Amino acid sequence: MMYEMHPDNNMPFEFRFFEYGLDIKGNGVGDDNWEMYIELKRIYGFVRDWYENDDIYHYLSYLFFNFKSKVNFVAIYKTWENSKGKLSFITELKKEISKYILEIYSNDGENNEEPAKEKLKNDLANLSFSWYHNKESLVKILILLDVIYSCKSNYRLPINYFVSKGEDIEHIGCQTPNEEDLNNKAKWLEYIKKLNDYKFDIDKGRLDEWWEKLLKEQEVIDDVTSNIIDELNSYGLNSIGNLVLLHSSQNRSYRNASFNTKKSIIIEDYYNDKYSIRPYTLKAFSSNHTSMWTLEDIKKSTETLAHDIIDFLI
């Protein structure tokens, strides 16, 4: 931080940069080591202020971890210096987060005047939009939800949760068979049989049609299952309201278990300290008090999520 704030074009960043101090005042008095010490104390002071304020801690950590190629310490420091107080600085950080989240919607190349925030809102609320296949943006949104809920509940998000590492994108419910089972006819027949329970409002005649096609197919069922997946996506299977981040080992331990089994394992693991769980993930699984995760649950989850994200952005 010291080097970034007081760079020396004639000296690389290494230990000797600190050896002779800095003539910050430019007075040539010979107290450069003392001046550097005072400056280090000053930097430590405001960085500690940042760390001890929950909002600043969360927003800065989110920016540095998720947009590190675009955010630098000096620019953040100048924003701090030019702010009228902590509340003003917090607002500026929210503006920075909003700018980078909405950037893809501001530069999408389409010739329309629809505001970027409105475009994001539409994608978040659209049940047929496949966020599962838009993983980079999805992860940033899900982590931002952790930040939002942590700030609201006075919970300090662990520093390793500002990035997704060793985690899978998990469907909360209604997931199709695992990748290794995509050609397993028995798994698909079992899945179609359960679709009525998910209350997806799929016409029974359509389900019967899928069932018959699978029964007739002797070996390769890729075409049939891919068509089923495409149609299910339009009902919200891959919408953002049906997706969370979950520890890879935990996710793979129950494979395609029912929602009720999955929910029980996740919450039990959390209370037994077997796995730490992200705030939004825990909220998603604990908010449903029934044994099923239906289309109605996906709709409610999607609406709540879209509202919380759009309400946060400036």
Regions found by a protein language model. Name each.
Residues 1-314:
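Flexible coil/loop and intrinsically disordered segments
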